[in-house]
Amino acid sequence: MVDREWVLKIAKLARLELKEEEIEVFQKQLSDILDFIDQLKELDTENVEPYIQEFEETPMREDEPHPSLDREKALMNAPERKDGFFVVPRVVEV
């Protein structure tokens, strides 16, 4: 069973704020996922050939130049901007 502290640690790494009732829900869901993985580990795959799909050539589109957005259009729907740049929350702790 996945414990509460483990769920909180995963949430912190993912930068998620969980409500109390969500913690319990995620405990159950993560536990179920890990149980399912354990079931998959028990499968006998000894005589199953690996599935490999190879392509001779990766399909790619033609590289055609297109005009890019001008700065004002790019920033038009930005919730916050400063000096012509997007302002975003800090995600790296110093």
UniProtKB/Swiss-Prot annotation:
Its EC number is 6.3.5.-. SUPFAM superfamilies: Glu-tRNAGln amidotransferase C subunit. GO terms for molecular function: asparaginyl-tRNA synthase (glutamine-hydrolyzing) activity; ATP binding; glutaminyl-tRNA synthase (glutamine-hydrolyzing) activity. InterPro entries: Asp/Glu-ADT_sf_sub_c (IPR036113), GatC (IPR003837). The keyword Protein biosynthesis applies. It catalyses: L-glutamyl-tRNA(Gln) + L-glutamine + ATP + H2O = L-glutaminyl-tRNA(Gln) + L-glutamate + ADP + phosphate + H(+); L-aspartyl-tRNA(Asn) + L-glutamine + ATP + H2O = L-asparaginyl-tRNA(Asn) + L-glutamate + ADP + phosphate + 2 H(+). It is an enzyme of class 6 (ligase). One of its GO terms (biological process) is translation. Keywords: ATP-binding, Ligase, Nucleotide-binding, Protein biosynthesis. Heterotrimer of A, B and C subunits. Belongs to the GatC family. Allows the formation of correctly charged Asn-tRNA(Asn) or Gln-tRNA(Gln) through the transamidation of misacylated Asp-tRNA(Asn) or Glu-tRNA(Gln) in organisms which lack either or both of asparaginyl-tRNA or glutaminyl-tRNA synthetases. The reaction takes place in the presence of glutamine and ATP through an activated phospho-Asp-tRNA(Asn) or phospho-Glu-tRNA(Gln). PANTHER family: GLUTAMYL-TRNA(GLN) AMIDOTRANSFERASE SUBUNIT C, MITOCHONDRIAL (PTHR15004:SF0). This is Glutamyl-tRNA(Gln) amidotransferase subunit C. It comes from Aquifex aeolicus (strain VF5).
